[in-house]
Regions:
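Non-heme di-metal
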Residues: 1-157
Length: 157
């Protein structure tokens, strides 16, 4: 995990969020422009969205350095993020939307709570299966190591 108190890390996280949001927003704008019959503008938005995605990946690589990230760490980050979404973020947003009478937002948030929980459970399941596979492989490797050691001992005797 990185130092979340560092201003540079906070700036990278904000830039990552902004570039990611711009990517999706511009894809959505392209869809709207295309539906309105403006193919040229749609293509400009799509091209820019592609660039925003590359910017987001650049920030992600600094935040989650590939050489330090293992599948285990990736799953941990994903579980933490999805769990935060369905236990804290979306329930708070839902409460505020209800207070303001934004029924459509409440319905959307309810769907996101369910999906975020499903995502967290999916990632947990993958992590648990990986742990079981690793444990099984460790037992096989231990058995092989003992066999090889016995063979070496027999040769040395």
């Amino acid at each position: 995990m990185h130092n979340t108190q560092s201003p540079t890390i906070q700036n990278l996280e904000a830039a990552f969020a902004g570039e990611s949001m711009a990517h999706i927003k511009y894809r959505y704008f392209a869809k709207l422009c295309r539906a309105a019959g403006d193919e040229a503008t749609a293509k400009v938005f799509e091209s820019t969205a592609d660039q925003e995605l590359l910017h987001a990946f650049g920030h992600a690589e600094l935040l989650f350095a590939g050489e330090t990230m293992t599948p285990f760490k990736c799953l941990q980050y994903a579980i933490k993020g999805e769990t935060y979404e369905y236990t804290e973020m979306y329930p708070k947003f839902r409460h505020e939307a209800m207070q303001e009478g934004h029924d459509a937002a409440v319905a959307e948030i309810d769907e996101q709570i369910v999906e975020s929980k499903e995502h967290a459970e999916m990632f947990k399941s993958v992590l648990e299966k990986a742990a079981k596979r690793f444990a099984a492989l460790a037992r096989v490797e231990e058995k092989h190591a003992k066999h090889y050691q016995a063979q070496q001992d027999a040769i040395a005797a």
